[in-house]
């Protein structure tokens, strides 16, 4: 049985060390941030809900890494890795979790 490699036109099946490093950093950042947010939530420091994606870091970072500038992302929960890979800053993430008007959702999330 021969296995054929299927590669979408214009895409590579290979990742550079730099791309792999960016994906790893996104995964690690997701885990650290969500661990901290959960502690804050359980301690009553966050008024909204937290929907962590613990255990799903690779999926989200991989999706984000595979997207280009033309792709539209409309995430809801457990999508922190996609946000980070698409360039959302940790400051923007924090502003959103704390419901600040300067955040991406203007405090309405």
Describe every region a protein language model picked out:
Residues 1-59, 65:
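Conserved acidic/glycine
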Residues 35-38, 45-109:
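Cofactor-binding active-site loop characterized by glycine-rich and histidine/acidic residues
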């Amino acid at each position: 049985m021969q296995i054929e490699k299927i590669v979408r036109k214009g895409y590579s099946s290979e990742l550079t060390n730099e791309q792999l490093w960016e994906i790893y950093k996104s995964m690690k950042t997701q885990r650290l941030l969500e661990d901290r947010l959960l502690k804050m939530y359980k301690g009553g420091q966050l008024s909204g809900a937290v929907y962590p994606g613990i255990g799903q870091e690779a999926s989200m970072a991989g999706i984000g890494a595979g997207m280009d500038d033309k792709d539209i992302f409309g995430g809801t929960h457990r999508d922190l890795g996609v946000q980070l890979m698409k360039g959302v800053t940790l400051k923007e993430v924090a502003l959103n979790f704390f419901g600040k008007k300067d955040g991406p959702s203007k405090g309405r999330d």
